């Protein structure tokens, strides 16, 4: 199911156009359920019952805000990758951006960058490499190697900085690569 969030009841031209194009594109994919929500009630539903949504498409302003909300519901804004897919150009990033407040402190959780890279690798047809990176990231988390934002006493085995977390993923990725 794909859900569009807009505020086309008020923003009739801009969000109205987004809603219209969403409906046109959805008609090209009759096997995928498509629905529309007004962004304010959709945001409340997303915060309360995130599992009710599979894929949510939004204009950039709402998407930038709600992707951070959804990531925080999942545990940290540092965990989610993001993809902006266009006809000719696509962009992949961590949803939290560059974390300038964390610059030079070895604190930022690089998970969003890893997951943005995984999305990019899938997008460019490098599924095997994406799987290796994703599995190495998952194994790092499962091993309890966590950055400050997700560190939890009794669950985490080690609190690490940005560089050490990235090195742990890289190390496991090399080991997983040898297995396949």
PLM regions: where:
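Glycine-rich phosphate/pyrophosphate-binding loop and the adjoining helix
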Residues: 1, 8-10, 138-180
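Conserved acidic
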Residues: 14, 125, 129, 161
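Glycine-rich phosphate/nucleotide-binding loop
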Residues: 46-146
């Amino acid at each position: 199911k794909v859900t569009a969030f807009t505020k086309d009841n008020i923003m009739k031209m801009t969000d109205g156009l987004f809603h219209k194009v969403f409906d046109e594109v959805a008609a090209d994919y009759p096997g995928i359920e498509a629905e529309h929500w007004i962004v304010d009630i959709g945001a409340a539903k997303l915060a309360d019952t995130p599992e009710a949504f599979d894929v949510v498409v939004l204009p950039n302003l709402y998407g930038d805000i709600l992707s951070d909300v959804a990531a925080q519901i999942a545990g940290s804004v540092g965990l989610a990758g993001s993809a902006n897919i266009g006809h000719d150009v696509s962009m992949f990033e961590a949803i939290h951006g560059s974390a300038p407040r964390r610059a030079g402190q070895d604190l930022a959780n690089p998970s969003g960058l890893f997951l943005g890279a995984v999305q990019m690798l899938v997008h460019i047809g490098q599924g095997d490499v994406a799987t290796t990176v994703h599995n190495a990231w998952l194994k790092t988390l499962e091993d309890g190697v966590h950055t400050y934002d997700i560190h939890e006493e009794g669950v985490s085995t080690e609190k690490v900085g940005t560089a050490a977390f990235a090195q742990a993923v890289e190390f496991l990725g090399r080991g997983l690569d040898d297995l396949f």
